[in-house]
A protein has these predicted regions:
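A structural boundary/capping signal
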Residues: 1-141
Length: 141
């Protein structure tokens, strides 16, 4: 169940990061993906055209509105704050009508399915837009 108020969301998010610190990469990514899919969904909150104005992780949790872009951003913030050597190459892409988080040289795809992290080829199509983990880390500082 998604935490109701901001302080509970902060505590739950901190616990998530702490738990994922010691898990192998795939179980950690599944746990992160599952946690963010519990967030209350809204059709539109953030847009790629407004990337410069995207909230930092604390504002994202405070806003408590999660469209697919916002949920992907939350996943990216979570992975980035783990600062794990094996999870240093994630990026969020706009691919067709989806906003996906790709990790470990696209081995894992998050923000696609609530119950699993998928491992499929996206083919040769180029993403329309993307944001790297390094760009996301700039919002955390």
């Amino acid at each position: 169940m998604w935490p109701r108020d901001f302080s509970e969301r902060l505590e739950s998010w901190a616990q998530l990061r702490q738990q994922c610190q010691t898990l192998d990469s795939e179980p950690a990514l599944i746990k992160i993906n599952t946690w963010w899919f519990q967030a209350p969904w809204t059709a539109y909150h953030l847009h790629w055209d407004d990337q410069q104005d995207w909230p930092d992780p604390w504002q994202l949790l405070s806003d408590n509105q999660y469209c697919p872009v916002a949920r992907g951003l939350g996943i990216m913030y979570t992975i980035s704050m783990l600062d794990r050597e094996d999870l240093q190459d994630c990026r969020m892409i706009e691919y067709q009508s989806d906003n996906l988080v790709l990790v470990s040289q696209e081995k894992y795809i998050l923000n696609w399915d609530p119950d699993q992290v998928v491992n499929i080829s996206l083919g040769r199509s180029k993403p329309r837009r993307q944001v790297s983990q390094e760009q996301i880390k700039q919002k955390i500082r």
